[in-house]
Amino acid sequence: MKTPFGKAAAGQRSRTGAGHGSVSVTMIKRKAAHKKHRSRPTSQPRRNIVGCRIQHGWKDGDEPLTQWKGTVLDQVPVNPSLYLIKYDGFDCVYGLELHRDERVSSLEVLPNRVASSRISDTHLAEIMVGKAVEHIFETEEGSKNEWRGMVLAQAPVMNTWFYITYEKDPVLYMYQLLDDYKDGDLRILQDSNDSPLAEREPGEVIDSLVGKQVEYAKDDGSKRTGMVIHQVEAKPSVYFIKFDDDFHIYVYDLVKTS
């Protein structure tokens, strides 16, 4: 299955494994974002599109124009131009500046907002969040692979879906995990370290890194910069990062370095 904007993604991603969940990053002083693409000038305040269905064109360089349809999940408070989007038929959550990115064309907000759905098992949903899990995927050949990951939160807007990330592929995904659990394709790992309360001393406050600019050194010596856009409530040391050169949302257990 093709992935939005020519990028590889999980479920759709090959799941060959890339990266890990715990990295060291360096906080850097806030500065102008690197211009990886052209952006439109800021205009007057726009309507709130969170919870709306959208469709738009996408054209990057000499690539052909393609059309995409999806649901706007969230508007990032520390960068209100940035929206989190779940595109139809794809499992990754994407971050795009919908009104500013000139690769986006003919953005249309569709008439009906996404209707709220009833959670089939609220108790299981509460137990699942913040837990390490093994998630089973079936390959095209019919074999099954187990992927260890962590359930991060119940997704906004599409509330029968859950945010999840994987040790070998630390990108933000979302699936209907209650269904997977009942089908035997998701197993909650009984690990005492999974409790967020076990990570804190009584009265301890974990400083938030949300809004901080970060620099990430890759294995090949190159560096990429980005912004911490969200702290996971169930695991306060875990954050979402949006890098300047990518529209995937990365999930890392951050270790602050000087």
Curated annotation (Swiss-Prot):
Residues 1-23 are annotated as: Disordered. Residues 210-255 are annotated as: Tudor-like domain 3. Residues 50-99 are annotated as: Tudor-like domain 1. The record marks 169, 176, 180 as: Histone H3K4me3 and H3R8me2a binding. GO terms for molecular function: histone H3K4me3 reader activity; methylated histone binding. It comes from the Eukaryota. GO terms for biological process: gamete generation. Residues 129-178 are annotated as: Tudor-like domain 2. Gene3D superfamilies: Spindlin/Ssty. Residues 138, 246-248 are annotated as: Histone H3K4me3 and H3R8me2a binding. Belongs to the SPIN/STSY family. Exhibits H3K4me3-binding activity. Interacts with C11orf84/SPINDOC. This is Spindlin-3. It comes from Pongo abelii (Sumatran orangutan). The gene is SPIN3.
